[in-house]
Amino acid sequence: MSNENRTCSFCGKSKSHVKHLIEGENAFICDECVSNCIEILHEDGNDGTPSESAGGEPEESGKLPTPAEIVANLNDHVIGQEQAKKALAVSVYNHYKRLRHPKAGANVELSKSNILLIGPTGSGKTLLAQSLARKLDVPFVMADATTLTEAGYVGEDVEQIITKLLGKCDFDVEKAQRGIVYIDEIDKISRKGDNPSITRDVSGEGVQQALLKLIEGTVASVPPQGGRKHPNQEFINVDTTNILFICGGAFAGLEKVIRQRTEKGGIGFGASVHSKDENADITKLFGIVEPEDLIKFGLIPELIGRLPVIATLEELDEDALINILTEPKNALVKQYQALFGMENVELEFEEGALRSIARQAMERKTGARGLRSIVERCLLDTMYRLPDLKGLKKVVVGKAVIEEGREPELVFEP
């Protein structure tokens, strides 16, 4: 194309009608269109020049929620666990504050506040991590430590966690490098004894060592679009230095390790007296856990050193489980009431029924996680027949429905 026939690919003006015509690959743009683009960016509050953040990355837009705001949001989704919420909120706030103001700590190296959550099954560890990520609007991924193996063994190696994180943000590396990773069942990869085994520990200490590199900060090489690694292929490099890692586990048996440390032992007047409430005992002991207890349990010292914030969650009692059933925004009772409401039917749970549901969950040792299966079981037949029950106005779930397996009371229009 001759110089005279060249036109702006956006407005169509020829070179003779504008001051400058900038040439790109198979396209042209004039100086007037460039000016218009700059004005649009200014109107949107973005001049096109990203501010510097940690690692030379653009700083996130939007206000960083304060610890109090984070806790208030967590209260909408998670019942109780006030100390754990505070510990999480402060750690997460400090972590992202550090990323947004890298120059403020130029003379002091600010360490990352990775978190270890210790609490029984169904106490809210996973839900806390999920709710945090949702509030902060950052990529979030969960991994099960029991499925991880050392690189070179059959199974999921630790770098696949980063592959999943990239997938959550459409392989946007900058977003992934500021995400949150929650690793569940971290207690299940503890080494089985104080002395390292002479045999290969595929899913124990070896995995802890591999996770250590990821948590303390390394450049992970991830195959494009999450494919398998092959020789001579290009990889996506992801720096894990600013990824926040939250590890969680039930740590069954840790209370015995703590008790051994805190008690002198003995008989007669020197013997220790335990509470009749075993759950209260365990909660109290978890509250005084020390790094040395976790090392004796089977976590390697280096990994514990990279998880400086330890938050313990309490065993949920009957009242807490009832509150979980009814109070949060996504409470189970509200969910089922919404489902019945779509059929123009009111659903009511009597107080006795709620207590029975909570009691059964406690007996099963499943915590909040077991509530849904109990409610689902008692409503299954009713939900099966619901669309065909003409004139039905109300379903009442009483204590006998939960404890004796009776049918809920059905109230029809007169």
From Swiss-Prot:
Domain ClpX-type ZB: 1-49
Listed GO biological process terms: cell division; proteolysis involved in protein catabolic process
InterPro entries: AAA+_ATPase (IPR003593), ATP-dep_Clp_protease_ClpX (IPR050052), ATPase_AAA_core (IPR003959), Clp_ATPase_C (IPR019489), Clp_protease_ATP-bd_su_ClpX (IPR004487), ClpX_bact (IPR046425), P-loop_NTPase (IPR027417), Znf_CppX_C4 (IPR010603)
Keywords associated with the record: ATP-binding, Chaperone, Metal-binding, Nucleotide-binding, Zinc
Residues reported in the UniProt entry to bind ATP: P120, T121, G122, S123, G124, K125, T126, L127
Annotated spans, Disordered: 44-65
Keyword Chaperone: yes
GO cellular component: HslUV protease complex
Binding site for Zn(2+): C8, C11, C30, C33
Single GO term (MF): protein dimerization activity
Coiled coil (UniProt feature): none
Assembly behavior: Component of the ClpX-ClpP complex. Forms a hexameric ring that, in the presence of ATP, binds to fourteen ClpP subunits assembled into a disk-like structure with a central cavity, resembling the structure of eukaryotic proteasomes.
PANTHER family named in the record: ATP-DEPENDENT CLP PROTEASE ATP-BINDING SUBUNIT CLPX-LIKE, MITOCHONDRIAL, ATP-DEPENDENT CLP PROTEASE ATP-BINDING SUBUNIT CLPX-LIKE, MITOCHONDRIAL-RELATED
Similarity-based family: Belongs to the ClpX chaperone family.
HAMAP family named among the record's database cross-references: ClpX (MF_00175)
Physiological role: ATP-dependent specificity component of the Clp protease. It directs the protease to specific substrates. Can perform chaperone functions in the absence of ClpP.
Name this protein carries in UniProt: ATP-dependent Clp protease ATP-binding subunit ClpX
Annotated gene: clpX
